[in-house]
Amino acid sequence: MKRIIFYLAGMLFTVSCFADGTAPVEPWYRNGFQSGVGVSVTGGLNIFAGYHNPELSSPWLRYFGARIGLATTDPLKSAIDSMIERYMQDGRDVGDGVKIDEGKLDAWHGNVLVDYYPFRGSWRLTGGYVWGAMSLDSKIFGSIDEAPAQRFYFYLAGDHYYYNGNNFSGSAKIDWKYYGPYLGSGFDFDIFCGFSFFIDAGVVFTNRPARMVLEIPHEQLYIYNKETSSWGPVTIAALDRDVAAAEHDANRKLSDWRLYPMVKLGFAYRF
C-alpha cells in the first residue's frame, strides 16, 4: 500500500511539473510567491518568504521582488562552533605568548529586502534593512611549554605582569547589537519544478561597532611597581584599571569597522 501511495504521489508531482500549455491560465499573482531556507556562517540558518514575478504585465514591477527573513545560529550551533574550533586549533597567537582559543558564536538577524533584476534574469541587486546581534566568546591563554618552571610574563596597558606559574587563562567577549541598511547582490538559479538555488552576498552598514569585554583572573597575579622597582600582588583596582584601558584601546580600533558581512547559500521554491 505504501508503494502505491508513493507511486501515485510521484505521478502527481511529475504531471504538475511538466504539464503542457493546455492548463487553465493562472492569475497574475501566481508563480511569484516563494519561500526558502539557507545557511550562513555569520547568520546560521535563514528562512525567508517573498514575491517576484518576471512575467507581470507592469513594465516596472516585473523587475522587482521583495523578501522578509529571519536567521539564527541556534540550529547550527554545534557545526559552527566545530568550524571555529578547527580554525583555532592550538590557538591563534596574538603576541607576547598569548593565544586565543575556543570561539563560541551566537547570532541572529531579521531583514526586509527589495530585489532588483535589471535583466529579468538570475542576477539581482539587493537593498533593504537588517537588524540583529552577534556574540563571540573566546578563551585567551598563555604558557611556556619549554620551561614549565618559569613565570609567565606579559604586558597589559603598559604595566608588566606575571602569574605565579608558567601559564594563565582569561576570556574575551565581543558583542555586536546592530541595525542599518543592507546592500548586496546575488543570483537565483532555476533547477526544476519551481525549485531554485540562491546566493546572497552583501554587507550591513551598522549603526554602531562591536564592543569587546576582557576578563583576566587576579588570583596569583603579580604586577611590577615602577616606583619601588619591585614585584607585588596586584590589587583588583589596579587590574581593573589596566583591563579598562586595554578594552578602550581595542574598542577604539573596533570603532573603525562598522560593516557586518553576510554571505548566504540555500534553496527556494516558487509557488
Regions found by a protein language model. Name each.
Residues 1-4:
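Positively charged n-region of N-terminal signal peptides that target proteins for export
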Residues 14-16:
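N-terminal signal peptide c-region/cleavage motif recognized by signal peptidases
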Residues 20-32, 55-64, 119-122, 190-197:
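Short loop/turn motifs that connect adjacent beta-strands in outer-membrane beta-barrel proteins
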Residues 23-27, 36-38, 72-110, 133-179, ...:
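Extracellular/periplasm-exposed beta-strand and loop segments of Gram-negative cell-envelope proteins
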Residues 31-37, 47, 62-68, 112, ...:
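Transmembrane beta-strands of outer-membrane beta-barrel proteins
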Residues 39-43, 53, 70-76, 118, ...:
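Transmembrane beta-strands of outer-membrane beta-barrel pores
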Residues 108, 115-120, 126-133, 139:
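Secretome/extracellular-domain signature
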Residues 169, 176-193:
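A contiguous pocket-lining binding segment that forms or flanks enzyme active sites
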